[in-house]
Amino acid sequence: MALIEKMTKDIQQKGGLIVSCQPVDNSPMDKPDIVAAMAQAAVNAGAVAVRIEGIDNLKATRPLIDVPIIGIVKRDLPDSPVRITPWLNDIEALAAAGADIIAFDGTDRLRPVPVKALLEHVHRLGKLAMADCATFNEGMYCHQLGTEFIGSTMSGYTGGEIPKLPDLQLVTALAEQGCRVIAEGRYNTPMMAARGMQAGAWAVTVGSALTRLEHVCEWFTQALKWQQELDK
């Protein structure tokens, strides 16, 4: 719990930004040294933690920063839609590489390893756990199991059209039940991040708007094209 206390203090002093340093897959930025540099820059600018995907990226980042790292492994499985840290050996690899917090998919979907087993393995290795959830019931289930952090990460990403705005209602509902909520997913502007905190988030994770240059360039390009069409 010492880490949680330290993070809580840092959040109170610095504002509660967690930066997800996950470049677009196979892009020019998708290299461990660049991911590590992103993480360093984020910490220098006041991030209280970073979220890192992949063992090589984590190993490159760990020696360079002293804030907590939320570690994940993403996989594309042939028989399950679950992508985030689906296996027990993923947890072992993340712990060995220096993750302080290990995040896993906490959704109620077909999976190779039950959520409870993933959580127990994280704790067995002396790490804190974060469950990336999509719904209130999923979040509460993980919270009641003893998961330290509940992320709204998967809201909008388990089927159907992806919403444009964050799920603030989910953040509020979970926070009101005593969950330590990390708001994540479509917090693409400072104002939306602030609204996440207002909704009850313990911290807010921002990814694409900070570390996926291609996405941000596309947002600007689309806005300019839209204006050009209006001016015709």
Swiss-Prot record:
Keyword field contains Isomerase: yes
CDD domains in alphabetical order: NanE (cd04729)
Top-level class of the enzyme under EC nomenclature: isomerase
EC numbers for this chain: 5.1.3.9
Pfam families, A to Z: NanE
GO terms, biological process: carbohydrate metabolic process; N-acetylmannosamine catabolic process; N-acetylneuraminate catabolic process
Keywords, comma-separated and alphabetical: Carbohydrate metabolism, Isomerase
This protein's record includes keyword Isomerase: yes
Molecular function as annotated in GO: N-acylglucosamine-6-phosphate 2-epimerase activity
Any one GO cellular component localisation term in the record: cytosol
Catalytic activity field: an N-acyl-D-glucosamine 6-phosphate = an N-acyl-D-mannosamine 6-phosphate
Pathway: Amino-sugar metabolism; N-acetylneuraminate degradation; D-fructose 6-phosphate from N-acetylneuraminate: step 3/5
Taxonomic superkingdom: Bacteria
Role noted for this protein: Converts N-acetylmannosamine-6-phosphate (ManNAc-6-P) to N-acetylglucosamine-6-phosphate (GlcNAc-6-P).
Family from the record: Belongs to the NanE family.
Record protein name field: Putative N-acetylmannosamine-6-phosphate 2-epimerase
Gene designation: nanE
